[in-house]
A protein has these predicted regions:
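Conserved N-proximal alpha/beta basic substrate-recognition cap immediately N-terminal to
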Residues: 1-86
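Short glycine-rich anion-binding loops that position phosphate/pyrophosphate groups of nucleotides
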Residues: 38-40, 113-114, 222
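Rossmann-like NAD(P)H-binding beta-loop-alpha module
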Residues: 84-107
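A short linear hydrophobic-aromatic micro-motif
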Residues: 86, 106-109, 135-137, 201-204
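Protein kinase-like catalytic core scaffold
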Residues: 107, 158, 202, 215-218
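Phosphate-binding site of ATP-dependent enzymes
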Residues: 112-197
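A long amphipathic alpha-helix within ATP-dependent nucleotide-binding catalytic cores
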Residues: 168-216, 224, 228-230, 234-249
Length: 249
């Protein structure tokens, strides 16, 4: 869809297949490369890192790598002052248990490198964790929905509300989504998270707080735009064209 928007503008582009690229023998320099649909594996990261030396890759490999790790994402969000649930990352079940006892007798386990809501569950005792360490756990924030905010160039441009009968509300986990307006406090939370990561565009997942405002669950560096009514492909195409023009000045 983004490619179709570029075609409408008469913007020339070429597809780059990372499965068959040798970055040391590729005559590509001074270009804008949109890393769409990237698989989060070491080979593609290394290819893009090599290409970044002579080109502008969007999103950057550093940003994508940060978003792939819940630990690094959370560390940057907390350091920036953006809202985040209380979090524990440790090899020790004893420390996990102390965290649970301090945060209402339950917590949420999440795989460090998980995606689409896979492998996430609530537990009440550290002994319930079956996975090997390290353990990444967060306080449980009572909710019946979450929000995915699409951010481009540090501006919230689209949002959906996701709901399900389960702990996670991801569309891939059976959740349903509908487009919603973006109030200022929602935009502020999403935009501050994007700035904390330093990412061109992203999907920021937020939970509403009973006391008001929102907290940042995670930042997705390769987001889709399921259920969005905002013209995300058009806005992304506009951003890519703008960045390319700025890079060529």
């Amino acid at each position: 869809m983004v490619m179709a928007e570029l075609q409408k503008r008469g913007v020339p582009y070429a597809k780059l297949d990372l499965a068959s690229v040798d970055p040391f023998n590729l005559p590509v320099s001074g270009e804008t490369i949109w890393a769409c649909g990237i698989k989060q594996d070491g080979v593609q990261f290394e290819l893009l890192k090599a290409l970044e030396l002579e080109n502008h890759v969007i999103n950057s490999t550093d940003a994508i790598a940060t978003c792939a790790s819940k630990v690094t994402t959370t560390a940057k969000i907390i350091r920036s002052g953006a809202p985040s649930p209380a979090t524990c990352f440790t090899n020790s079940k004893e420390i996990v248990q102390k965290f649970i006892d301090t945060h209402g007798g339950k917590a949420v386990y999440k795989p460090v490198y998980g995606f689409d809501g896979n492998g996430i569950y609530m537990f009440h005792s550290a002994d319930e964790i079956k996975e090997e360490p390290p353990y990444y756990v967060q306080e449980y924030v009572k909710n019946d929905r979450d929000f995915r905010i699409f951010v481009i160039d540090y501006e919230a441009v689209g949002a959906i509300k996701r709901q399900s009968a389960h702990l996670t509300h991801n569309i891939h986990q059976g959740g349903t989504g509908c487009a919603v307006e973006i109030p200022k406090d929602m935009a502020d939370a999403a935009e501050s998270a994007a700035r904390a990561i330093g990412i061109d565009y992203c999907g920021v997942d937020l939970l509403p707080l009973e006391t008001g405002g929102y907290t940042v669950l995670e930042v997705n560096g390769t987001p889709n735009w399921h259920c969005m009514t905002a013209p995300i492909p058009k806005l992304l195409a506009d951003y890519l064209v703008k960045q390319d023009k700025e890079d060529r000045r």
